């Protein structure tokens, strides 16, 4: 099949429609011949096509036609285009509307684009009546009437026949088409002789109801039947037009309907393009519950007998396989035989006679039950990233469930509580070969961005790894017993006693080094905990092995160690009983007594405070402060429990070192003091969205407590532990949280899935080019992919070593640090980076040596400097900054830290060049990789409890998915959270006083109203000065609040005001008022709204506290800073303040408006990264890539839009935009087939690599070189001859 490089869209012309010879002329018929269900329109439901005789898999259908008897029917989707054209011509004479007469001898093709635009403006500028002296009629405005379903004259609502419009449009001369932006013959906007009937394939029969009668058909078929019926009756133009519109897009004439039509099935997320072409249901698939198996490796998947006997795989007949196929036929193992010459598939059954069908010629194939070791794709949904779908070798296993190795459970996000997985057996040999390499677990061992292994030990294996390392005094037989089948090659080296460390050294099997962890393949760490054996850890032994050698060794270690850990457990056993958790009741009784005592003290103190407030002895705190103090007391109680449990664990470890529960804690598996607190101590405060449950009827959550009770237990503090059990009310509070979480999970799954799909669609065509740059189409996004031009799975986070005077080359390192340090102080100077990105894990090649054997200090510096200069020029073309790489090598290989030999240094830099040369291939789909990693992580977060909000000063800054969603949607005209940071608190206080909302009611005023005296009302407002001070305002501000409210009040006619100091604690504001009529009513209104309406600042439910924190200027320079967050629409509101030396951190749109697109990109990148929280620094690269794409043009663009990136028509159509194909056809667009979506449609391999280079030879270049060389040799020979002649 020829490779299609370009596609052009256009409208069907009438000749193409008329060319089909399948005429549809009946509404009903006994055998459906001549109806819209005619068998000649394609194969359906197992029946062969009556036109081509093929099955529904091979026949793509045939078009029919129904006569419309010379009626002109408008193609419904182009009604607006016809109205646009009619606005440019006179409906009477058909000439172009113009202010002045124009000549028809203009050659528009010779005009430049600018000249054409000027002519267009001149000719098409409007005038009221036609310039044609033979017409002179006023121009008519033509519109389409939804009610009459035809074109009408807007002035008098008189029908304008389609035939008249047709004649006027086709009479426009072709030379004027560029002026009117007509791209093809206007007749194509109409159906004239025949209307096309689409093939059966797009309208499969389904059951639905019409007028309470069940129909076994398709709604499109039903609508087509109505068109045929009206055409047979030779109905009016409007009747046929209406039937065609109902079939095409009913929304053109009716807004409140949702019936299925062509527009409906090609738009939205259930469009046919997405459901039947981009992805569809497949044969040779299976689905079952999954379970673990200890007998299969990471590279295998266990398949039960019933799936093996159902799925079949093809064996193609050729010279190599013909004998095998004959054997299979003889042994009755063949299920199907396909004869290519006869184009016939034969099912082979026991005892069935087959005559002249089996020829076994090349190209034929047989289907047999799937065999062991065949590669099969399997995965668990939701498939959030590529580690959820892998291709492994089939193994036969017992039982009825699919078996997977526990080592891959993490990457599949699978547990064994009823999870299901699907599997598909690909039939194409090319697909099988491709999947068996690119989707094989060994290939996928290391995470694309994180760089750590995605496979590793789970559950009991972690404890086994810990216990095995600690075991001592093993004899050889015991070692060989633990090693099992892997013990054959174990070399005792003359020793009689062995430890767990020796077993690990044997399993590692390589002379590998790593600072503080490995020395010559031997573990030098104190313990082996979960960090060494589980997935997604940078210290994973499997990861270090694969960094040192290859993924094969890494996977091999996982397989061997998993087997050994399981054997260790089966020999020595491991179990946790309730006795391990709670040897006796002494400790839990003690904890319970402490908890009861403390909660009573808290309640007592709280009750005393409430009584004192009621009696007027003290001034009450604000509600927020009161809640904070209560919460802080309860948190102290929780922390007390944790401290007691930590002490208990420490003591138990001394008394009972073999306690299995504590072994788990030490191994880093499952057990931590907080979880033990729930079981043994207290279940703690239950929260919904980060807050205690809100009170409801009678000021309480549950009827277990008195109305308006302030009891902390009545707001969800559960005192009991799970060991003691929960009371009725406590159980209710725990279920309240469970209910809100389950609801959140249901909703968030949908939201995260939607955004994930949008991000992948946005980033899918972003690839690495041959120079290691990131491009999308012809647009350059990043100069250096992954910053290092090395595959993301090869890059490695390493410790960031800060400059120190004890270092060799201190001055050079300091100078480099000063150039790059800005990138390591981030998040408004609150955080200092502890890690940085190394181009590869060179630390596994660092072998310490003695001073005598070490490379000279100057030689090592020169080597590092020369390598970096060479790489900067040859690989990064001096365009990208790679100072960070030089800094890493200078600090980590610093002679003051470690001495290495010259050979070690050469090895490290040879590996560096190797990674630069061979890991990151042109075409690597870095966009899809980044999009999947981002999406997988925010989905996991949204489904965990991470999306609770965090109080960041005043405004609750949303964390997690919500904020990420807002950032990528980039909504304009919304308030943004502005952060102000300064070391001078007074500058922030002036902003706070102006913006913080304070109303009179918050100051707990004492109102008193005197009767009307001397024709005026007197209102006394007495406020305690303590409340004014607590609100951080002054008496003058309170006076201003009252004055401002009264002066703007429309119900006050006249007013006056006096301020008095009542006593040392109180101040009195006396207001004199006259109201407009009706006075009594307005007085009541005034008194009612006074507490809330007399206010200052921006109305908000949040306060604006100023918090202090330690800010970093450098790793060794900190200072006290004050921070305040405020919600503003625009930074102009800050214009009247003195903000000198105040750092203002605006939102994304304010950043863009002030500093431009590059600053917006940096803001977006950091803001998106911050939504993930701690420990996700490795997501910086995908966040940066997404931010760079959103800011690739002059203005930030939402993930929902493709305004700047030239998204192809097929990509838009796949995305659910059914207008994309219509517009492309109307404008006769031509587009290259480059992007993923377009390649999918035209069976073209997308321009995406696999991380490997494609090598090719440019023969033309060789020929040119050959000519140059021959010319050079010729000239050299002539020169030599001339010199000889001279002698």
From Swiss-Prot:
It holds the Pfam family RNA_pol_Rpb1_5. The keyword Transcription applies. Its EC number is 2.7.7.6. Gene3D superfamilies: 1.10.132.30, 2.40.40.20, 6.10.250.2940, RNA polymerase ii (3.30.1490.180), RNA polymerase II, clamp domain (4.10.860.120). One of its GO terms (cellular component) is virion component. Its main location: virion. GO terms for biological process: DNA-templated transcription; DNA-templated viral transcription. The keyword Nucleotidyltransferase applies. GO terms for molecular function: DNA binding; DNA-directed RNA polymerase activity. It comes from the Viruses. InterPro entries: DNA-dir_RpoC_beta_prime, RNA_pol_asu, RNA_pol_N, RNA_pol_Rpb1_1, RNA_pol_Rpb1_3, RNA_pol_Rpb1_4, RNA_pol_Rpb1_5, RNA_pol_Rpb1_clamp_domain. It catalyses: RNA(n) + a ribonucleoside 5'-triphosphate = RNA(n+1) + diphosphate. Keywords: DNA-directed RNA polymerase, Nucleotidyltransferase, Transcription, Transferase, Virion. SMART domains: RPOLA_N. Part of the DNA-dependent RNA polymerase which catalyzes the transcription of viral DNA into RNA using the four ribonucleoside triphosphates as substrates. Responsible for the transcription of early, intermediate and late genes. DNA-dependent RNA polymerase associates with the early transcription factor (ETF), itself composed of OPG118 and OPG133, thereby allowing the early genes transcription. Late transcription, and probably also intermediate transcription, require newly synthesized RNA polymerase. Belongs to the poxviridae DNA-directed RNA polymerase 147 kDa subunit family. The DNA-dependent RNA polymerase used for intermediate and late genes expression consists of eight subunits Rpo30/OPG66, Rpo7/OPG90, Rpo22/OPG103, Rpo147/OPG105, Rpo18/OPG119, Rpo19/OPG131, Rpo132/OPG151 and Rpo35/OPG156. The same holoenzyme, with the addition of the transcription-specificity factor OPG109, is used for early gene expression. This is DNA-directed RNA polymerase 147 kDa polypeptide. It comes from Vaccinia virus (strain Western Reserve) (VACV).
């Amino acid at each position: 099949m020829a490779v299609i490089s370009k596609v052009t869209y256009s409208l069907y012309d009438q000749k193409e429609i008329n060319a089909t010879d399948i005429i549809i002329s009946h509404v009903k018929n006994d055998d459906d011949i001549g109806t819209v269900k005619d068998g000649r329109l394609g194969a359906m439901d197992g029946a062969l096509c009556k036109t081509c005789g093929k099955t529904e898999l091979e026949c793509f259908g045939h078009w029919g036609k129904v006569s419309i008897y010379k009626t002109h029917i408008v193609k419904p989707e182009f009604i607006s285009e016809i109205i646009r054209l009619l606005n440019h011509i006179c409906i009477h004479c058909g000439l172009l509307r113009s202010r002045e007469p124009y000549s028809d001898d203009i050659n528009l093709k010779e005009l430049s684009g600018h000249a054409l635009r000027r002519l267009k403006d001149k000719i098409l500028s409007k005038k009221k009546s036609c310039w044609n002296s033979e017409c002179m009629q006023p121009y008519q405005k033509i519109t389409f009437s939804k009610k009459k379903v035809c074109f009408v004259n807007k002035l008098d609502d008189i029908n304008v026949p389609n035939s008249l419009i047709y004649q006027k449009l086709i009479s426009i001369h072709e030379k004027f088409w560029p002026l009117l932006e007509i791209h093809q013959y206007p007749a194509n906007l109409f159906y004239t002789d025949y209307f096309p009937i689409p093939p059966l394939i797009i309208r499969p029969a389904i059951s639905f109801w019409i007028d309470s009668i069940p129909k076994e058909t398709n709604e499109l078929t039903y609508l087509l039947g109505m068109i045929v019926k009206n055409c047979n009756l030779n109905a009016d133009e409007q009747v046929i037009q209406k039937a065609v519109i109902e079939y095409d897009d009913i929304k053109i004439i009716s807004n409140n309907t949702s019936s299925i039509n062509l527009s409906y099935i090609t738009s939205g997320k259930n469009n046919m393009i997405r459901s039947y072409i981009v992805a569809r249901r497949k044969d040779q698939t299976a689905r079952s519950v999954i379970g673990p198996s200890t007998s299969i490796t990471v590279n295998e998947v266990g398949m039960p007998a019933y799936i093996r006997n159902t799925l079949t795989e093809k064996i193609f007949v050729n010279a190599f396989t013909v004998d095998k196929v004959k054997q299979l036929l003889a042994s009755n193992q063949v299920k199907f035989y396909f004869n290519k010459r006869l184009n016939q598939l034969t099912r082979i059954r026991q005892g069935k006679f087959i005559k002249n069908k089996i020829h076994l010629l090349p190209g034929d194939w047989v289907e047999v039950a799937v065999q062991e070791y065949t590669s099969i794709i399997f995965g668990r949904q939701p498939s959030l990233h590529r580690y959820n779908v892998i291709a492994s070798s089939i193994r036969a296993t017992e039982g009825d469930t699919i078996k997977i190795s526990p080592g891959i459970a993490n990457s599949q996000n699978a547990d064994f509580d009823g999870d299901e997985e699907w599997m598909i057996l690909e039939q194409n040999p090319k697909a099988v070969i491709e999947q068996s390499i690119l989707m094989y677990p060994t290939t996928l061992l290391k995470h694309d961005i994180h760089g750590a292994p995605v496979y590793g030990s789970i559950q009991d294996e972690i404890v086994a790894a810990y216990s095995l390392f600690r075991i001592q005094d093993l004899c050889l037989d015991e070692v060989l017993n633990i090693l099992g089948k892997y013990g054959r090659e174990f070399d005792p080296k003359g020793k009689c006693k062995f430890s767990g460390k020796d077993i690990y050294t044997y399993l590692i099997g390589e002379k590998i080094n790593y600072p503080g962890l490995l020395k010559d393949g031997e573990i030098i760490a104190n313990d082996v905990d979960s960090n060494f054996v589980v997935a997604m850890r940078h210290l994973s032994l499997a990861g270090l092995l694969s960094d040192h050698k290859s993924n094969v060794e890494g996977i091999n270690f996982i397989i061997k160690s998993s087997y050994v850990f399981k054997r260790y457990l089966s020999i020595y056993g491991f179990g946790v009983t309730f006795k391990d958790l709670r040897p006796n009741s002494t400790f839990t009784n003690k904890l319970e007594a402490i908890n009861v005592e403390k909660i009573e003290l808290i309640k007592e103190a709280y009750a005393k405070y409430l009584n004192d407030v009621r009696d007027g002895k003290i001034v009450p705190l604000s509600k927020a402060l009161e809640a904070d103090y209560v919460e802080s007391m309860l948190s102290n109680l929780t922390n007390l429990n944790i401290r007691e449990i930590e002490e208990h664990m420490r003591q138990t470890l001394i008394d009972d070192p073999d306690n299995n529960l504590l072994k788990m804690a030490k191994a880093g598996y499952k057990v931590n003091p907080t979880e033990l607190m729930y079981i043994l101590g207290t279940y703690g405060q239950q929260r919904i969205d980060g807050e205690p449950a809100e009170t409801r009827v009678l000021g309480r959550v549950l009827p277990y407590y008195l109305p308006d009770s302030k009891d902390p237990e009545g707001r969800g503090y559960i005192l009991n532990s799970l060991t003691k059990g929960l009371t009725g009310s406590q159980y209710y509070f725990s279920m309240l949280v469970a209910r809100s979480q389950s609801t959140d999970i249901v909703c968030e799954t949908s939201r995260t899935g939607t955004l994930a799909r949008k991000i992948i669609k946005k980033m899918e065509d972003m690839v690495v080019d041959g120079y290691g740059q990131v491009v999308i189409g012809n647009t350059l996004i990043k100069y250096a992919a992954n910053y290092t031009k090395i595959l993301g799975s090869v890059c490695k986070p390493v410790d960031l070593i800060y400059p120190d005077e004890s270092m060799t080359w201190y001055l050079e390192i300091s100078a480099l640090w000063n150039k790059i340090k800005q990138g390591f102080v981030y998040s408004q100077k609150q955080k200092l980076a502890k890690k940085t990105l190394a181009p590869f894990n060179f630390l596994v090649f660092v072998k310490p040596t003695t001073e005598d054997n070490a490379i000279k200090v100057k030689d090592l510096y020169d080597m590092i400097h020369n390598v970096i200069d060479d790489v900067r020029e040859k690989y990064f073309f001096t365009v990208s900054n790679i100072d960070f790489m030089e800094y890493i090598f200078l600090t980590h290989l610093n002679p003051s830290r470690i001495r290495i030999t010259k050979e070690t240094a050469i090895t490290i830099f040879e590996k560096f060049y190797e990674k630069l040369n061979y890991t990151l291939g042109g075409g690597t789909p870095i966009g899809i990789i980044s999009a999947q990693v981002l999406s997988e992580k925010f989905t996991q977060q949204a489904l965990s409890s991470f999306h609770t909000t965090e109080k960041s000063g005043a405004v609750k800054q949303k964390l997690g998915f919500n904020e990420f969603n807002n950032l990528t949607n980039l909504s304009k005209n919304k308030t943004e959270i502005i952060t102000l940071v300064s070391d001078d608190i007074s500058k922030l206080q002036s902003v706070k006083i102006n913006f913080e909302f304070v109303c009179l009611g918050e100051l707990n005023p004492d109102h008193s109203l005197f009767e009307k005296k001397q024709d005026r009302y007197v209102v006394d407002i007495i406020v305690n000065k303590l409340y004014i001070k607590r609100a951080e305002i002054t008496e003058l501000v309170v006076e201003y609040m009252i004055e401002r409210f009264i002066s703007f009040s429309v119900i006050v006619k006249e007013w006056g005001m006096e301020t008095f100091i009542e006593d040392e604690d109180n101040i009195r504001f006396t207001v004199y008022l006259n109201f407009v009529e009706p006075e009594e009513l307005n007085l009541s209104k005034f008194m009612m709204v006074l507490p809330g309406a007399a206010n200052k600042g921006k109305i908000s439910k949040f306060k604006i506290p100023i918090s202090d924190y330690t800010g970093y200027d450098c790793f060794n320079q900190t200072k006290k800073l004050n921070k305040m967050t405020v919600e503003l629409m625009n930074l102009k509101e800050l214009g009247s303040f003195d903000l000198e030396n105040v750092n203002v951190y605006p939102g994304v749109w304010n950043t863009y408006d002030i500093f431009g697109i590059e600053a917006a990109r940096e803001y977006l990148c950091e803001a998106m990264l911050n939504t993930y929280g701690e420990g996700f620094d490795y997501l910086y690269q995908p966040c940066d890539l997404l931010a760079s794409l959103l800011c690739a043009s002059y203005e930030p663009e939402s993930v929902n839009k493709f305004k700047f990136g030239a998204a192809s028509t097929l990509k838009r159509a796949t995305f659910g935009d059914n207008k994309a194909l219509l517009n492309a056809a109307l404008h006769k667009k031509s587009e290259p087939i480059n992007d993923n979506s377009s390649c999918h449609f035209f069976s073209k391999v997308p321009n995406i690599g696999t991380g490997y280079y494609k090598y090719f030879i440019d023969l033309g270049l060789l020929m040119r070189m050959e000519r140059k060389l021959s010319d050079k040799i010729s000239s050299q020979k002539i020169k030599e001859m001339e010199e000889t002649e001279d002698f």
